[in-house]
């Protein structure tokens, strides 16, 4: 009857389910060279705030919503306290980033509190950061589909993992409660995987 047919169809579907996606679409992955071009474009246009903000996100792995935690006090301490869903995690800030943050804050006459502010003294919104980054695409020669704040976090994750090979530590740094989430951040287009296969030299 209908029920047995439905069960067979479900079983077939279960057998045919495609393995979890392992590689990322080429049009979505931002690489280090493209990131550098975005920074250069921002600086050549005199957009120092945007260039520094991108460096801050990409060198720490913070979420764009956590940029408000980058305060003068955090830069002086070398770490920021980030609160999310009742949990607080400590984000270490590279010494070079701290120096740049403090120098920028000084030029903006910001003695304390948030460093990245609008001209009216308000914190930058996610939408504003997104739009400002998109504005760099043409000059930087980077596809628009690759340029959005969260992709800087993905670039940080891949760089951190290549250096440490410690996915548990990376999950802590990113503030992930599940390593499965962290695995998504480490997906690449597959080009690196292909190079590794070639280096194995197992085809004579």
Regions picked out by a protein language model, each given a short descriptive name:
Residues 188-204:
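DNA/chromatin major-groove-contacting recognition/catalytic segments
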């Amino acid at each position: 009857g209908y029920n047995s047919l439905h069960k067979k169809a479900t079983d077939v579907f279960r057998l045919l389910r495609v393995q979890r996606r392992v590689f990322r679409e080429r049009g979505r992955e931002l690489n280090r060279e493209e990131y550098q071009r975005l920074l250069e474009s921002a600086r050549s246009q005199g957009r120092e705030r945007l260039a520094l903000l991108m460096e801050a996100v990409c060198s720490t792995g913070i979420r764009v919503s956590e940029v408000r935690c980058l305060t003068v006090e955090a830069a002086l301490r070398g770490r920021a306290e980030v609160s999310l869903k009742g949990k607080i995690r400590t984000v270490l800030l590279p010494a070079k980033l701290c120096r740049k943050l403090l120098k920028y804050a000084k030029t903006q006459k910001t003695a304390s509190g948030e460093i990245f502010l609008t001209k009216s003294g308000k914190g930058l919104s996610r939408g504003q950061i997104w739009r400002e980054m998109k504005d760099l695409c043409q000059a930087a020669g980077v596809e628009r589909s690759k340029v959005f704040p969260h992709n800087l976090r993905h670039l940080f994750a891949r760089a951190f993992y290549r250096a440490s090979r410690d996915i548990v530590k990376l999950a802590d740094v990113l503030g992930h409660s599940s390593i499965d989430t962290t695995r998504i951040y480490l997906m690449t287009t597959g080009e690196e995987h292909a190079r590794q296969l070639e280096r194995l030299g197992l085809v004579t």
